[in-house]
Amino acid sequence: MLWKRFDSTKKKELVGPYKNGGRELRAQGDPEDVQVHDFVDETGKVAPYGVYDLHKNEAWVSVGISHDTAEFAVQAIRTWWQEMGAPTYPAARSLVITADGGGSNGYRLRLWKLELQQLVDELTLPITVCHLPPGTSKWNKIEHRLFSFITQNWRGKPLITHQVIVNLIAATTTTTGLAVRSRLDARLYAKGRRVSDRQLATVNLVPHRFHGEWNYTIHPTGTI
């Protein structure tokens, strides 16, 4: 079975009693107090990384509290597979990912490819990645079928804690039956991890004939 999904990181969100654009129905005379200035405090920001299953109209969102890195992105994909992918597609023989061309899953990032190789070896499944060309990230279906509805669902609600954010994401649904699961990823991911030429050479990557820099398949180590 060839399985296709879309993934991306939503923009970072402030955690705390800050203004969140939109309106919410409340009792008259009972407005919710928020801070005037949105200076980042000790709770910081979160980076929601989404995995959207086009076939099932289901999604997983890992809410990161650290840096939005390639390691974080691949960990979100790993968690999706453990929690949703493997139970839904037990006979899968390969995976296809459509991803943005930049960000934590950018096509230029060596760490993205190295971390994917580790995941491929764990799953013993080849993973094909198709990056959207530069300047076309809004073509990513995850923007229109997941992130836009998450934004609608929490509009007007201050994102006061990590758990509130996770709960609001998981409560997102649509008239077409979108189902979302979410979890906080409390791991700390280091910025600026370097991947040497020697490490990159261990990635069993086969570029496709059409724009191999954007389209490629990573196979389990030693299989090709």
Each language-model region and where it sits:
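Short, conserved catalytic/metal-binding motifs centered on acidic residues
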Residues: 7-8, 57, 100, 140
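RNase H-like two-metal-ion nuclease catalytic core shared by retroviral integrases
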Residues: 107, 129-151
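C-terminal accessory extensions appended to soluble enzyme cores
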Residues: 156-224
